[in-house]
């Protein structure tokens, strides 16, 4: 994945796909939110079967013509220091992503799971 490529380039272990986080990220992307709702994100992750803490990234953009949606999302997150730090957080070991396209707009979520941290809404 593009996220794991960024992690490799920055000397941190790759993330393993986690189905509960994949499901949660897809549910969150389908909400068509343009900003984070931490409580909804954490509650959705728990409801999908991931009871631990998560780091989350969200990016919303017009569907690109010159690169894939995954490439554009990772580029956007890489250009924002907070989102970049979430991508390379060495405490995280699992990954879930979700993409919804609505009226030519891509809503992309990334959840990085940290089994050692607590979900504040669990």
Predicted regions span which residues?
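Short, surface-exposed glycine/acidic/tryptophan-bearing loops
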Residues: 23-68
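Non-transmembrane alpha-helical segments in soluble domains
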Residues: 3-4, 26-33, 59, 74-78, ...
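A short alpha-helix/helix-coil micro-patch that ends at or immediately precedes a cysteine
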Residues: 1-34
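Second-shell loop/turn segments in exported
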Residues: 8-17, 55-74
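Bulky hydrophobic/aromatic "packing anchor" residues in well-ordered structure
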Residues: 7, 25, 58, 111-112
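Disulfide-stabilized extracellular recognition modules
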Residues: 64-122
């Amino acid at each position: 994945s593009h996220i794991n490529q960024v992690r490799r380039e920055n000397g941190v272990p790759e993330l393993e796909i986690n189905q509960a986080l994949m499901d949660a990220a897809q549910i969150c992307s389908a909400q068509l939110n343009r900003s984070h709702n931490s409580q909804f994100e954490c509650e959705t992750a728990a409801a999908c079967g991931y009871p631990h803490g998560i780091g989350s990234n969200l990016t919303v953009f017009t569907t690109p013509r010159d690169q894939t949606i995954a490439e554009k999302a990772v580029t956007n997150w890489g250009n924002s220091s907070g989102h970049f730090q979430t991508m390379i957080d060495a405490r995280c070991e699992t990954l879930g992503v979700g993409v919804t396209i609505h009226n030519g707009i891509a809503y992309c979520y990334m959840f990085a799971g940290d089994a050692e941290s607590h979900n504040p809404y669990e």
